[in-house]
C-alpha cells in the first residue's frame, strides 16, 4: 500500500592635465572591506546542582517581580510544574513546588501562597507556572541530555501579563524524573492544546508579554484537572472520577488529561465497560489530532508484550478499541514503532519495525476491514520524546507505538521497508 506524502567597492576617478596638453588619468580605489565577523554565539549556561539551580531561578523570579499597583499582600497560586516536553508531573517537579513554597513563606512574605482552585482563580491571583526539561546543554540536536532547563514564570491574572521570569540549568545528578502516578498510568500521549498553552506561557514569553490566551481561557479547568490528579495519586479514584466528569462539562474541558483521567479512574474502580468507552474517546481525540502514541511495553529485544500482567492486562482491549475506532472512521493509519537509544541503531531500527508489524497484524485481526489500510514502519531511536536513556518509567514514551493518520492510496502489503 502506498501513502501520499560582496562587498561593494567604491571607486573614485581623478582626472588631471599638464601644461603640455597631455592628459593623464589616474584611478584609485578604496580596498574592499571584509564582511563583519559573525559574532560568536554566547557560551551555554553552566549547569549547577539542582538545589542551587532552583534557588537561583526562584530568587530571580520573586526579587524581580513587577508588582506595581499590586496590593500589599499578593495571593500566589502554583499551577503544578510539568515536564516541558511530555507535560507530565514528576517527583522532580513536585520537589520543585515544595522548595518554592517553603522559600516564599520564609523569604517573600508579601506573597501569600493559596491553593490552586477555581475559587482562588476567580480572585485573579498571581499564578506561578514552570517547566522542567531534560536538554543537551550545548543545544546539540540529538545530543545527550546532560542538563535540565528550569523555567519559572509569574502570570498576573488581573492584567493577564507575565510579570517575572526565572531560568537556570541544573545538573542531572540526583534528579528523579519518575512520573507521578496519574501520568505513569496514562496509556496515551497526544498533542494537547491545554498543555501546549501552559508550556508556551512559560517558555515562549518575556516579562511584559500577554499570557497565552488559550492558557487563560482554560485555567479554571486546569484547577479541576489538578484536583483530579491529586485524588488519583492519593488513590481516591471515586473522587477523581467525579472531578474529571465535572471538568468535561466545563468549557475547555475536553482535553487529553481529562479523557485519560476518566479512563483511569473507571479502570481502577473495575468499571470495565465505562473504562473502555472512555478509552475509545481517548483514541478519537488522538486520531483527531492526527497522531496517537500508546505505551505498549515489550520484552527486551522482543515483539512480545512484557510478562507483568498488571501492566499488560488492558493491552488487548486497547488494541480492540484502536481497531474499532480506526475502522469506523474509514481512514488509514501508519503504525510506527519507536525505541530508546539503548543498543545498536541498526538493531533498534529493525526491532521497532518488527514491533510495529506485530501491532499492525493485531489490529487487522480485530478488524478485517483494516487490511490494506495500515502500514508499519520503524523509527528506532531517531524520534525520542524524552531522550534521557534511563529505560524506566520516566522515558517510557521513547518506547511507544504511534498511530498516525495517513492518506489512503492503492496497492502494497503495508509492511515496513
Give the location of each predicted region.
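Short, solvent-exposed beta-strand/turn patches at coil↔beta or beta↔helix junctions
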Residues: 38-52, 287-321, 339-346
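Periplasmic peptidoglycan-binding/anchoring modules of Gram-negative envelope and division proteins
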Residues: 52-71, 303-336, 361-365, 403-417
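A short, hydrophobic beta-strand-centered structural micro-motif
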Residues: 60-61, 75-80, 106, 113-155, ...
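N-terminal segment of the mature soluble domain
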Residues: 69-122, 161, 366, 371
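Periplasmic OmpA-like peptidoglycan-binding domain that tethers envelope proteins to the cell wall
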Residues: 87-103, 273, 306-309, 338-417
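Alpha-solenoid helical repeat scaffolds
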Residues: 225, 256-261, 293-294
Amino acid at each position: 500500500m502506498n501513502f501520499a506524502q560582496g562587498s561593494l567597492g567604491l571607486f573614485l576617478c581623478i582626472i588631471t592635465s599638464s601644461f603640455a596638453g597631455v592628459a593623464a588619468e589616474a584611478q584609485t580605489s578604496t580596498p574592499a572591506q571584509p564582511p563583519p565577523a559573525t559574532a560568536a554565539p554566547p557560551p551555554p549556561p553552566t549547569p549547577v546542582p539542582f538545589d542551587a539551580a532552583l534557588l537561583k531561578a526562584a530568587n530571580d523570579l520573586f526579587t524581580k517581580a513587577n508588582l506595581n499597583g499590586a496590593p500589599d499582600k499578593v495571593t500566589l497560586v502554583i499551577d503544578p510544574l510539568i515536564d516541558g516536553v511530555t507535560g507530565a508531573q514528576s517527583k522532580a517537579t513536585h520537589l520543585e513546588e515544595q522548595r518554592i513554597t517553603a522559600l516564599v513563606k520564609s523569604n517573600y512574605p508579601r506573597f501569600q501562597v493559596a491553593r490552586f482552585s477555581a475559587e482562588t482563580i476567580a480572585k485573579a491571583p498571581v499564578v506561578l507556572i514552570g517547566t522542567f526539561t531534560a536538554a543537551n546543554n550545548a543545544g546539540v540536536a540529538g545530543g545527550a541530555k546532560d542538563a535540565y532547563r528550569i523555567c519559572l514564570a509569574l502570570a498576573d491574572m488581573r492584567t493577564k501579563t507575565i510579570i517575572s521570569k526565572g531560568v537556570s540549568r541544573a545538573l542531572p545528578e540526583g534528579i528523579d524524573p519518575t512520573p507521578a502516578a496519574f501520568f505513569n498510568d496514562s496509556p496515551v500521549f497526544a498533542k494537547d492544546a491545554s498543555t501546549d498553552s501552559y508550556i508556551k506561557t512559560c517558555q515562549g514569553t518575556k516579562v511584559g508579554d500577554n499570557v497565552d490566551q488559550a492558557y487563560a481561557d482554560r485555567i479554571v479547568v486546569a484547577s479541576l484537572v489538578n484536583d483530579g490528579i491529586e485524588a488519583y495519586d492519593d488513590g481516591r479514584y471515586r473522587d477523581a472520577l467525579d472531578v474529571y466528569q465535572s471538568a468535561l462539562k466545563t468549557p475547555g474541558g475536553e482535553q487529553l488529561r481529562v479523557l485519560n483521567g476518566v479512563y483511569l479512574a473507571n479502570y481502577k474502580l473495575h468499571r470495565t465497560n465505562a473504562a473502555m468507552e472512555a478509552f475509545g474517546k481517548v483514541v478519537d481525540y488522538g486520531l483527531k489530532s492526527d497522531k496517537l502514541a500508546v505505551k505498549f511495553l515489550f520484552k527486551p529485544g522482543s515483539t512480545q508484550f512484557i510478562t507483568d500482567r498488571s501492566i499488560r492486562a488492558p493491552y488487548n482491549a486497547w488494541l480492540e478499541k484502536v481497531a474499532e475506532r480506526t475502522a469506523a472512521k474509514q481512514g488509514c493509519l501508519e503504525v510506527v514503532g519507536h525505541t530508546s537509544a539503548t543498543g545498536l541503531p541498526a538493531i533498534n531500527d529493525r526491532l521497532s519495525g518488527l514491533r510495529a508489524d506485530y501491532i499492525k497484524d493485531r489490529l487487522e485481526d480485530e478488524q478485517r476491514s483494516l487490511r490494506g489500510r495500515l502500514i508499519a514502519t520503524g523509527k528506532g531511536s531517531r524520534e525520542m520524546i524524552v531522550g534521557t536513556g534511563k529505560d524506566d518509567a520516566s522515558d517510557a514514551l521513547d518506547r511507544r507505538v504511534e498511530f498516525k493518520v495517513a492518506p489512503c492510496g492503492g496497492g502494497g502489503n503495508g509492511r515496513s521497508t
